[in-house]
């Protein structure tokens, strides 16, 4: 395209008159086709690109001796840019914007539901704390009951063992005291007998104590 636009000035001067008529006919033809296409049918962008490239390839109808040569390149490029923007709007920006809007609405709805569930969560947390407190009190009461029952059982066993041991000790002491008394009586009798024999041997026969 740049090579076509960079043709020598002589070729532009030679083809000045016939080129002046041809672009006008093509422009009129393209303007007649545009309403028929209605710019909504962008399924065939190749046709628009071919027409635009043909217009850009034609030499400009400029007179020799002017400082600047103006042609249809700038309007054609502007038209291509507008067509590209319309095509992107229909095929890219609109679907992507729709998806982003749906995603935004979904996120907002989820955030709203989460905010609405905050009261329910607080209620459930309070209920859980109440249940935990009740369970702790029940467990503590159960432990105290078991501890009291076990302590009572231990006290009963201790008292029974103590009473049994005390009875056995008292019985043993009574038996020992009885044995001691009988032994003392036997010893007293033996002492009296021995004393009598000693006195009998020591004292004369006619003396009695």
From Swiss-Prot:
Pfam families listed in its UniProt record: ATP-synt_B (PF00430)
GO molecular function, one term: ATP binding
Transmembrane feature ranges: 67-87
Keywords of this entry: ATP-binding, CF(0), Chloroplast, Hydrogen ion transport, Ion transport, Membrane, Nucleotide-binding, Plastid, Thylakoid, Transit peptide, Transmembrane, Transmembrane helix, Transport
Keyword DNA damage in record: no
One GO cellular component, as annotated: chloroplast thylakoid membrane
Localization per Swiss-Prot or TrEMBL: Plastid, Chloroplast thylakoid membrane
Transit peptide: 1-62
Topology term for the membrane: Single-pass membrane protein
Principal location class: plastid
Keyword Ion transport: yes
Biological-process GO terms, alphabetical: proton motive force-driven ATP synthesis
HAMAP family: ATP_synth_b_bprime, ATP_synth_bprime
Further comment: In plastids the F-type ATPase is also known as CF(1)CF(0).
Role: F(1)F(0) ATP synthase produces ATP from ADP in the presence of a proton or sodium gradient. F-type ATPases consist of two structural domains, F(1) containing the extramembraneous catalytic core and F(0) containing the membrane proton channel, linked together by a central stalk and a peripheral stalk. During catalysis, ATP synthesis in the catalytic domain of F(1) is coupled via a rotary mechanism of the central stalk subunits to proton translocation.
Family note: Belongs to the ATPase B chain family.
Subunit comment: F-type ATPases have 2 components, F(1) - the catalytic core - and F(0) - the membrane proton channel. F(1) has five subunits: alpha(3), beta(3), gamma(1), delta(1), epsilon(1). F(0) has four main subunits: a(1), b(1), b'(1) and c(10-14). The alpha and beta chains form an alternating ring which encloses part of the gamma chain. F(1) is attached to F(0) by a central stalk formed by the gamma and epsilon chains, while a peripheral stalk is formed by the delta, b and b' chains.
Name of the protein this chain belongs to: ATP synthase subunit b', chloroplastic
Species per Swiss-Prot/TrEMBL record: Chlamydomonas reinhardtii (Chlamydomonas smithii)
């Amino acid at each position: 395209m740049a090579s076509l636009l960079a043709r020598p000035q002589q070729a532009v001067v030679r083809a000045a008159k016939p080129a002046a008529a041809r672009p006008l006919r093509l422009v009129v033809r393209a303007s007649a086709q545009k309403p028929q296409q209605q710019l909504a049918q962008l399924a065939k962008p190749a046709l628009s690109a071919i027409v635009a490239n043909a217009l850009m390839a034609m030499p400009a109808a400029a007179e020799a001796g002017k400082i600047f040569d103006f042609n249809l390149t700038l309007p054609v490029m502007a038209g291509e840019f507008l067509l590209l923007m319309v095509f992107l709007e229909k095929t890219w920006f609109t679907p992507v914007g729709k998806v982003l809007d749906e995603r935004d609405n979904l996120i907002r709805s989820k955030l709203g539901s989460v905010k609405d569930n905050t009261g329910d969560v607080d209620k459930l947390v309070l209920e859980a704390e109440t249940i935990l407190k009740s369970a702790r009190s029940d467990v503590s009461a159960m432990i105290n009951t078991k501890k009291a029952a076990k302590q009572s059982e231990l006290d009963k066993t201790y008292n029974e063992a103590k009473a049994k041991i005390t009875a056995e000790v008292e019985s043993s002491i009574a038996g020992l005291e009885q044995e001691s008394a009988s032994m003392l009586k036997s010893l007293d009798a033996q002492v009296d007998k021995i004393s009598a024999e000693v006195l009998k041997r020591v004292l004369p026969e006619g003396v009695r104590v």
